[in-house]
């Protein structure tokens, strides 16, 4: 049954997700991407929720910007309940919603100290450039046109997990790569030079060894060989 000017009420699973009711939401997997999806259209909300779950995201779906602020604990400047346990990696919201537009929700999030670093993606069925530019200038991470496709969701999820994967691979490469050899000290360099014995021939320059006048060559050939001990 619709309330609040035609905005659909939260389903039971959504109520559990934001802590309404007797049941408590299960603890979040630290490695699982948690997405807050905001859309006043029940059909669009179901579609985006299913697409996100296909990509192994945990999804909390709400039907208005005010509900999103309540979940984040940003309504009336209140602190979020159990803020340390609350983990939101991405907020994806529709632009045209009654009561509070996606643009207004974006501004509220970016003005907060707790969630201003969380990526916010805006969805809309209308391709209006002024609207897109305004959202991007306000800090939106991306602007998706409806209907949202699975490829769009996969791209957003890979963007969110890219830093973690690169860091893990970087640490792995650092562990497997042997460290470079230490630089030689001045003492070791001197010891190395002292231990090297150079041949007398190596002291002669190449040009000197090849340069000999004809007179010198003739004198060497014509000089008699003398045996040792003979005068």
Curated annotation (Swiss-Prot):
Residues 170-231 are annotated as: Disordered. GO terms for biological process: circadian rhythm; cytokinin-activated signaling pathway; phosphorelay signal transduction system; red light signaling pathway; regulation of DNA-templated transcription; response to cytokinin; response to red light. Induction: By cytokinin (zeatin) and nitrate. The modification 4-aspartylphosphate is found at residue 94. Predominantly expressed in roots. Residues 185-199 have a biased composition (Low complexity). Belongs to the ARR family. Type-A subfamily. This is Two-component response regulator ARR3. The lineage of its organism: Eukaryota, Viridiplantae, Streptophyta, Embryophyta, Tracheophyta.
């Amino acid at each position: 049954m619709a309330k609040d000017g035609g905005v659909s009420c939260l389903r039971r699973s959504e109520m559990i997700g934001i802590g309404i009711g007797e049941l408590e939401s299960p603890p979040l997997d630290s490695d699982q991407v948690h997405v807050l999806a905001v859309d006043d259209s029940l059909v669009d909300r179901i579609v985006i929720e299913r697409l996100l779950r296909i990509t192994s995201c945990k999804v909390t779906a709400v039907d208005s910007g005010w509900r999103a602020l309540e979940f984040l604990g940003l309504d009336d400047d209140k602190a979020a309940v159990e803020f340390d346990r609350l983990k939101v990696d991405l907020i994806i919201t529709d632009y045209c919603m009654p009561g509070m537009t996606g643009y207004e929700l974006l501004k509220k999030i970016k003005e907060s100290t707790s969630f201003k670093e969380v990526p916010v993606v805006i969805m809309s069925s209308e391709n209006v450039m002024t609207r897109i530019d305004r959202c991007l200038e306000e800090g939106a991470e991306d602007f998706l046109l409806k209907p949202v496709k699975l490829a769009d969701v996969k791209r957003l999820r890979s963007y969110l997990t890219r830093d973690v994967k690169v860091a893990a691979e970087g640490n792995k490469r650092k562990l497997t790569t042997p460290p470079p050899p230490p630089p030689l000290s001045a003492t070791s360099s001197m010891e190395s030079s002292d231990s090297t014995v150079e041949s007398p021939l190596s002291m002669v320059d190449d040009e000197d060894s090849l340069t000999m006048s004809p007179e010198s060559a003739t004198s060497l050939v014509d000089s008699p060989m003398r045996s040792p001990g003979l005068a």
